[in-house]
């Protein structure tokens, strides 16, 4: 799968599961990205559900993006997704989407929806 070219070369990231201590940085990215934001309680309520998963992208031990998605029987649904303003146009979002695509299965989940 190919995505549009970025203005700069992709940054090197570590993409991992979101953990509770990430919330301060995630909330900063959320508030800088959206007019109507999720609260910390919104994030936590969602992540407490068995089918809801969070991931973060880190560059040099700093969180530069996050994604919250739900697992459904035949698809993955992205609920919330943002990249820090200073990290945009560097392939962060594309790398996170590619990681999500890797989680698709030919037998079960075959699509990603927003």
Where are these regions (language model features)?
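Acetyl-CoA-dependent GNAT
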Residues: 3, 8-10, 17-88, 94-107
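Conserved hydrophobic beta-strand within the GNAT/NAT acetyltransferase core sheet
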Residues: 78, 112-114
């Amino acid at each position: 799968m190919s995505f549009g070219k970025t203005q700069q070369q992709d940054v090197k990231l570590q993409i991992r599961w979101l953990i509770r201590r990430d919330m301060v940085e995630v909330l900063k990215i959320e508030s800088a990205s959206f007019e109507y934001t999720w609260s910390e309680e919104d994030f936590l309520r969602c992540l407490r559900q068995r089918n809801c998963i969070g991931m973060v992208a880190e560059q040099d031990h700093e969180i530069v993006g996050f994604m919250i998605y739900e697992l459904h029987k035949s698809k993955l649904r992205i609920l919330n997704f943002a990249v820090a303003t200073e990290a945009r146009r560097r392939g962060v979002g594309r790398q996170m989407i590619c990681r999500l695509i890797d989680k698709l299965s030919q037998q079960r989940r075959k699509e990603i929806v927003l």
